[in-house]
Amino acid sequence: MKTVFTALAAAALSVAMVSAHAYDPKATIADLEARLAKIGAAKLEGTDTAGTKTVPAIFFGDRKVNNNYDVVDAVRKAHNATATIFVKEGDEFVRVSTNVLTPEGKRGVGTQLVRNAAYEAVSKGRQFCGAIDVLGTAFDACYNPIKDASGKIIGVSYIGHKK
């Protein structure tokens, strides 16, 4: 009987650990950052479109991220999370790669990061993790500033788990 109980307790702990990790915003943003770093250093080069806007093109290594959804969709698959890469345009951050959908069911490319607590933190070079509204939906989210080789903020990475 003791062996059966121990096996069941170990299985329950294993499931709890997997569930906690799968929905841990800090672990998910760390995974997104690792995926981007594996591609290469962040940089801006030229311009591209994001929805109806012309914005700087953001690259990781030689891969342009604007309108490329491989990384954000991989994060969704691995963590059941939304993910976005924003590029800095003036004093705004514009979505250039995202799996966040608009109310019409389209990717939110070209929409801006709302000026909220996350915006304030990343604008100052700090991470933000907490509850936030993204295009009308509540999320437990993390945002990190994306910096180029000189340390200049050129964008933002985001992940969110629906509440």
Task: Give residue spans per PLM region.
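Extracellular/periplasmic ligand-binding regions of membrane signal-transduction receptors
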Residues: Y23-V65, V100-E104
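Conserved beta-strands of PAS-like sensory domains
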Residues: F59-K64, T137-K163
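Residue-level signal for well-ordered, solvent-exposed loop/turn and beta-edge residues enriched
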Residues: E92, K106, S150-K152
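Extracytoplasmic/periplasmic sensor domains and loops in membrane signaling proteins
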Residues: N66-N80, S97-G136
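Gram-negative bacterial Sec-dependent N-terminal signal peptides
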Residues: M1-A20
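Short N-terminal helix-loop-first-beta-strand/juxtamembrane motif that initiates sensory/input modules
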Residues: T28, E33-G46, V72-F93, C129-A131
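N-terminal leader/targeting segments
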Residues: H21-A22, R126
